[in-house]
Amino acid sequence: MRNLKNILLSFSALAIASTLSTVVIAKEWRGWNIHKPGYPNTVAMDKFAELVKQKTGGEITLKMFHSGVLGNQPDAIEQVRIGGLEIGNFNLGPMGPMAPEANVVSLPFIFKNMGHMHRALDGAAGDQISAGMEKIGIVALAWYDSGARSFYNSKKPIMKPSDVKGLKVRVMNNDLYSGMISALGGNPSPMAFSEVYQSLKTGVVDGAENNWPSYESTGHFEVAKYYSLSQHLIIPECVCINDKVYNSLSDKNKKAVKEAARESAKLQRALWEKRAISSREKVMKAGVEFNEIPNKKAFMDAMQPVHTKYLSANPNLVPLVDLIKNTK
């Protein structure tokens, strides 16, 4: 009888051990996003988190932190790069100084329009940019829209390059943007996105440049009522993951996470298109003075030295720039 009990206990222990060995401990990730609730990126990143949990069968959960509550964008990029955060929704502008291949999208007028950007990023150019990002420890899972950036300020309409002369213009922290404003005769003021409203209100800067949804959602239109449709930059955003975190996943979960990101990108692009229209309508009703720019070639010509200087310093990137420009 005692031997039978011992045998049964042994079988029970083996069964428990076997069960425990098949238990998968859920991974809990944290994700960063600068935008407020309701913004297309915020809605899409929440959908991404939902899809990650669903597609991995609960093996991975993602908690999103919106409105930049975990820090500013350059710091968050660094945190994802070193593994302090797993996920981030980043604009490629602040990432460019760290990843030269990603920086080419910050060259003024490199994209003709949104469709051109989509085709370039969804093709060979996007693959090269992704490879450049992986060199610094970041994997691009999917590309989000970020619209076309135009100038706005509190002083006057901008119709021609010389209208920027003397204006203090906030830019993201990237030498390409500072060079762009300097080429127009303006005074670039790199600063964090969260500081722009107060800086516009108090006159620390005269203007900035961004897309319609950001201009509206931040309230910048309340303190800088002149919006001039220069569309000088079309900078994509990415859903990014730390490379070590991504490479530690099973093939099944790698596929699941990438699928989740790309499905969220489809949602984000659709939401972005609608939000751009509604944001424009809202600020126009609020009394913003809007103007088209009939001669954008004058701006292209004035900003050409930015291209020349950057590619002279980075000749290895000339083929990538040509690839983007020649994307049909």
Model-assigned labels for residue ranges:
Residues 1-11:
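Bacterial N-terminal signal peptides that target proteins for export
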Residues 9, 26-116, 124-328:
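N-terminal secretory/targeting leader peptides
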Residues 10-19:
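Bacterial N-terminal signal peptides
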Residues 19-26:
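Sec/Tat signal peptide C-region and signal peptidase I cleavage site
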